[in-house]
Amino acid sequence: MEFSAKQIAAFIQGEIIGDENATVHTFAKIEEGIPGAISFLSNPKYTPYIYETKASIVLVNKDFTPEQEVKATLIKVDNAYESLAKLLNLYEMSKPKRTGIDERAYVAETAKIGKDVYIAPFACIGDHAEIGDNTVIHPHATVGGGAKIGSNCILYANSTVYHDCRVGNNCILHAGCVIGADGFGFAPTPQGYEKIPQIGIVILEDNVEVGANTCIDRATMGATVIHSGVKLDNLVQIAHNDEIGSHTVMAAQVGIAGSTKVGEWCMFGGQVGIAGHLKIGNQVNLGAQSGVPGNIKSGSQLIGTPPMELKQFFKASIVQKSLPEMQIELRNLRKEIEELKQQLNK
């Protein structure tokens, strides 16, 4: 399917610099651009590529001014990266979609299936489960009894939504993710650890995306809640009774212990660990591998274990590199002081 620069500019409200009749049929990174491809430039580090790219159309920010000739047709927009996302969504929507239930899928008689749903081979839909309109269930995905999946969702292969859990509209669950497994709850006894039944559920609100092999545990009682717009990377662990605020994003291998509340619009780097029963405010940014043992107020930008402000962390890092030399210097100073004491005592 081809689109012209004129059509694209109209869709994303951009200004064309060059040939409005230039057409594209695919996407490419600016450094790998080919004729017939559309690319984008948002990071100044990649500016040199715009003068040599073979892409037919390039999205650029409005403040971009070429320093030499650019062969590609440019479309100037407020935010090139955001406009690219809109075009990619349009491209995905233009692809033909399958509907219907494959004969090799298992769908319980009591399940409710919406309109234009596709259920692939070997998918399993349990008793009294509900699947919303236009949702796609890929092979070997499982929706447990009584679970509810909203409209326009995608459940990729081997993703699992346990019984009675709730998934909102426009959610994406990537391969191998598990929604609603038991929380890690055990009571210590003289005979060992006795399992505490986890009778709660997980609620995913609208527009949530869950990465591959990410686990969100069901609550002991009540609900583990992931609010609207949350994006979780691969291999993230959300424990029982956690609550994650709207539009918070977490990179791979973040782990959050039970009953912690995370605010809205937070950003956590990879391998961040947060202890249980804490409150993390809104718009908190945590650098990679931060370890959080206590509450954090809104607007904080922290890194390290325990987390500290960025300036303090980088100052401490510089000092840390010098510790071996400082240790030698300290030993020498102690030795000199002891020698001076001995001389004074004579």
From Swiss-Prot:
Any Pfam family: LpxD
* CDD domains found in the cross-reference section: LbH_LpxD
- Where along the chain is the active site annotated? H240 (proton acceptor)
Q: In which pathway does it act?
A: Bacterial outer membrane biogenesis; LPS lipid A biosynthesis
Q: Which UniProt keywords apply?
A: Acyltransferase, Lipid A biosynthesis, Lipid biosynthesis, Lipid metabolism, Repeat, Transferase
| A GO term, aspect molecular function | N-acyltransferase activity
Query: Would you say which domain of life the source belongs to?
Result: Bacteria
Identify which top EC class this enzyme belongs to.
Answer: transferase
UniProt-listed InterPro entries: Hexapep, LpxD, Trimer_LpxA-like_sf, UDP_GlcNAc_AcTrfase_non-rep
SUPFAM superfamilies to which the protein is assigned, alphabetical? Trimeric LpxA-like enzymes
Which transformation does this protein catalyse, written as a reaction? a UDP-3-O-[(3R)-3-hydroxyacyl]-alpha-D-glucosamine + a (3R)-hydroxyacyl-[ACP] = a UDP-2-N,3-O-bis[(3R)-3-hydroxyacyl]-alpha-D-glucosamine + holo-[ACP] + H(+)
Self-association and partners? Homotrimer.
| Similarity comment: family membership | Belongs to the transferase hexapeptide repeat family. LpxD subfamily.
Entry-linked HAMAP family: LpxD (MF_00523)
Q: What is this protein called?
A: UDP-3-O-acylglucosamine N-acyltransferase
Originating organism = Bacteroides fragilis (strain YCH46)
